[in-house]
From Swiss-Prot:
One of its GO terms (molecular function) is ubiquinol-cytochrome-c reductase activity. This is Cytochrome b. Heme b b562 binds at residues 83, 182. Heme b b566 binds at residues 97, 196. The gene is MT-CYB. Signal peptide: none annotated. The cytochrome bc1 complex contains 11 subunits: 3 respiratory subunits (MT-CYB, CYC1 and UQCRFS1), 2 core proteins (UQCRC1 and UQCRC2) and 6 low-molecular weight proteins (UQCRH/QCR6, UQCRB/QCR7, UQCRQ/QCR8, UQCR10/QCR9, UQCR11/QCR10 and a cleavage product of UQCRFS1). This cytochrome bc1 complex then forms a dimer. GO terms for biological process: mitochondrial electron transport, ubiquinol to cytochrome c.
């Protein structure tokens, strides 16, 4: 008798995506992050839903409502810290997922890669708006500084900023609309993630060797479900350790002070996962130039498939390309560190050097390394 999962239309869909899905037999733990990102998204939606039940999106009560959730709501403290630190875990998985795509050449699956970039933008927008909601000092001033960047747009900049703010400054209207978008975007992200999977299953997964997986495939269940569950346990171990032992480790102490438009914090900075882009923004003395550099630091991912001139898909057997890749990783870590430092010597200079190196590595060094390797292998 044919199992129900192969006959029922809905079960058949799940079966083809998660159970009988043909997967390459040699994919490593770096392929775990897709399922971990899905888990993070579900966790964020569930915890966010419970937080929204008690949160008040109003400038006069937002800060107090967050304190109320932490103090008075049953297990409110753990829901809040799971949501805040869950976002950090989300971005860690996201960066590792993109890093794996770059290293093993998964960007050659264009539709999947491009939807992934849209997903990254949507996730960054959601996280930014979520950071504004507690209405602490860093929430308020972070929102003011980042939204103010729109004023760099020629001619319509000022109108654009006031349109986003809903007034002449970040105020109640801004908070209300940010809460609205913060609530709706995760569902849009879920739809995009489904499309991401749909396009991935059209081509099948890449593998570490960067060769065709067609001759040697195994079913996703039980082999990779077990492997993914191990990754999930490790993720939950790190997340719960953070939540239970150091819930405020990745946050900013200034956010425990209620938003005050008359008092600017000594050093305004976004959450840690935006610091690399923030460092690039600050490295350009011109406002419009800084905004363009900020946008290009993410949009450059769109150009990666075009810049791929190597004859091999994966970097596994390309030592020169590996060198440029790890240079890029080190550079991004340096930018993240610089983004959290005050705007003074020597941090300004280090930030500028690291910003130039970031674009140089992707646009010049990586393609040159690939061409040299092609030449050495007589594949030109």
């Amino acid at each position: 008798m044919t199992p129900l999962r192969k006959t029922n239309p809905l079960m058949k869909l799940i079966n083809h995506s998660l159970i009988d899905l043909p997967a390459p037999s040699n994919i490593s733990m770096w392929w775990n992050f897709g399922s971990l990102l899905g888990t993070c998204l579900i966790l964020q939606i569930i915890t966010g839903l419970f937080l929204a039940m008690h949160y008040a999106p109003d400038a006069s009560t937002a800060f107090s409502s967050v304190a109320h959730i932490t103090r008075d709501v049953n297990y409110g403290w753990i829901i809040r810290h799971l949501h805040a630190n869950g976002a950090s875990m989300f971005f860690i998985c996201l960066f590792l997922h993109i890093g794996r795509g770059l290293y093993y050449g998964s960007f050659l699956y264009l539709e999947t890669w491009n939807i992934g970039i849209i997903l990254l933008f949507a996730t960054m927008a959601t996280a930014f708006m979520g950071y504004v909601l507690p209405w602490g000092q860093m929430s308020f001033w972070g929102a003011t500084v980042i939204t103010n960047l729109l004023s760099a747009v020629p001619y319509i900049g000022t109108d654009l900023v006031q349109w986003v703010w809903g007034g002449y400054s970040v105020d109640n209207a801004t908070l209300t609309r940010f809460f609205t978008f913060h609530f709706i975007l995760p569902f849009i992200i879920t739809t995009l993630a489904t499309l991401h999977l749909l396009f991935l299953h059209e081509t099948g997964s890449n593998n570490p060797l960067g060769i065709s997986s067609q001759p040697d495939k195994i079913t996703f269940h039980p082999y990779y479900t077990i492997k993914d569950i191990l990754g999930l346990f490790l993720l939950l171990l790190i997340l719960m350790s953070l939540v239970l032992f150091a819930p405020d480790l990745l946050g900013d102490p200034d956010n425990y002070i209620q938003a005050n438009p008359l008092n600017t914090p000594p050093h305004i900075k976004p959450e840690w996962y935006f610091l690399f882009a923030y460092a690039i923004l600050r490295s350009v003395p011109n406002k419009l130039g800084g905004v363009l550099a900020l946008l290009l630091s993410i949009l450059i991912l769109v150009a990666i498939p075009t810049l791929h001139v190597a004859k091999q898909q994966s970097m596994m057997f390309r030592p020169l390309s590996q060198l440029t890749y790890w240079l890029l990783v080190t550079d991004l870590l340096t930018l993240t560190w610089i983004g959290g430092q005050p705007v003074s010597y020597p941090f300004i200079t280090i930030g500028q050097v690291a910003s130039v190196l970031y674009f140089t590595t992707i646009l010049i060094l990586m393609p040159i390394a690939s061409l040299i390797e092609n030449k050495m292998l007589k594949w030109t």
